[in-house]
């Protein structure tokens, strides 16, 4: 979930 605009992807980047 790094180059995806999915909610879990964003959560991974933020977390």
Curated annotation (Swiss-Prot):
Enzyme class (EC, first level): hydrolase
GO MF annotation list: serine-type peptidase activity
pH effect summary: Optimum pH is 9. Activity is relatively stable between pH 8-10 but drops at lower pH and is absent at pH 4.
Top-level taxon: Eukaryota
Thermal properties: Optimum temperature is 45 degrees Celsius.
Similarity remark: Belongs to the peptidase S8 family.
Described function: Protease capable of hydrolyzing gelatin and cell surface heparan sulfate proteoglycans (HSPGs) in vitro.
Record's keyword terms, sorted: Hydrolase, Protease, Secreted, Serine protease
Protein's UniProt name: Alkaline serine protease
Coiled-coil positions: none
UniProt-listed Enzyme Commission number(s): 3.4.21.-
GO cellular component: extracellular region
Quaternary assembly: Monomer.
Activity modulation comment: Inhibited by serine protease inhibitors phenylmethanesulphonylfluoride (PMSF) and di-iodopropylfluorophosphate (DFP).
Subcellular location: Secreted
Predominant location category: secreted
Source lineage: Eukaryota, Fungi, Dikarya, Basidiomycota, Agaricomycotina
GO terms for biological process, alphabetical: proteolysis
């Amino acid at each position: 979930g790094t180059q995806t605009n999915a909610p879990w992807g964003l959560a991974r980047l933020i977390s």
